[in-house]
Amino acid sequence: MAKGGDVRVKITLECTSCTRDSVDKKYPGVSRYITQKNRRNTPIRSELKKFCPYCYKHTIHGEIKK
């Protein structure tokens, strides 16, 4: 049986270019992905390159607070 709290936590990744740019786009909004990370292996905030449907390109998605 597992001891203590959960090691794997759910995190939300948000597009960094959508939050910075307020350029008039076809669809206004912010791209977000939900994933998991192991708190022991990666204690720092994670950043992944994912596709943003609002920017129409692959951008850096950073972890945000809940």
From Swiss-Prot:
InterPro entries: Ribosomal_bL33 (IPR001705), Ribosomal_bL33_sf (IPR038584), Ribosomal_zn-bd (IPR011332). One of its GO terms (molecular function) is structural constituent of ribosome. It comes from Cycas taitungensis (Prince sago). GO terms for biological process: translation. The lineage of its organism: Eukaryota, Viridiplantae, Streptophyta, Embryophyta, Tracheophyta. This is Large ribosomal subunit protein bL33c. Belongs to the bacterial ribosomal protein bL33 family. The keyword Lyase does not apply. It is found in: Plastid, Chloroplast. Keywords: Chloroplast, Plastid, Ribonucleoprotein, Ribosomal protein. GO terms for cellular component: chloroplast; ribonucleoprotein complex; ribosome. Its main location: plastid. Pfam families: Ribosomal_L33. It comes from the Eukaryota.
